[in-house]
Amino acid sequence: MANPRQRNKQRSGKPRLTRRNANKKAKAKIYGNFVIQQNWDKHATLRQNYARLGLLATPNYVTGGVEKLYPDPKRENEDRELTSEELDELKKSLPPGQAIVRRDDDGNIIEIIHGEAKTLDDVLDKEISIAPAKTEVVRQLEEEAVKKAARQSNKMLPLSAFEHAYIQRLINKYGTEDFESMAKDVKLNSKLFNGSKLKNLYIRMKATK
């Protein structure tokens, strides 16, 4: 039961002293990649940080960003004559069945460039151009992504209990070399795996022991 002094405090309009935690500015925690955490400026906005690090805050213009989803094509020297090499590249860049019509200033048709189907040699011989990293942070992120992809590609998944028992039965009968005979054994190889598949199961079994 409250005494008279406590009742007077409750009825009084004078505010009581409390800790001013509400006015303290909370420190923002930066989650995500370690490289970005180390280079983050806490005094700048998210868009400013991403622009400084060479990253995109928003993927395209449609979602509210400043980057255009379909940038305006370059119109420099579009009236000049194309070289034979440029003409071949333009034909290969167009899908089959599509064409580009070139006109003069009066609207008369000068040339119709039809798209050509790419051969397998064209795809294999085409050089892949790698754009240089804009900033040191982007270079570190790209290097980290390459290393992570290499680790995942070299990592073998362990066999399930069914796969382990499946390949073990075949190894007990045929050994660890004759995978073609394993593939022909329709009784033990009920899933009809080929020799390459059975060999891969054996390699994974050895690697994950």
From Swiss-Prot:
Gene Ontology biological process terms from the UniProt entry: assembly of large subunit precursor of preribosome; ribosomal large subunit biogenesis; rRNA processing
Record protein name field: Nucleolar protein 16
Localization per record: Nucleus, Nucleolus
Family per record: Belongs to the NOP16 family.
Keyword presence, rRNA processing: yes
Record's keyword annotation contains rRNA processing: yes
Function according to Swiss-Prot or TrEMBL: Involved in the biogenesis of the 60S ribosomal subunit.
Residue numbers spanned by region Disordered: 1-24
PANTHER family with a match to the protein in the record: HSPC111 PROTEIN-RELATED, NUCLEOLAR PROTEIN 16
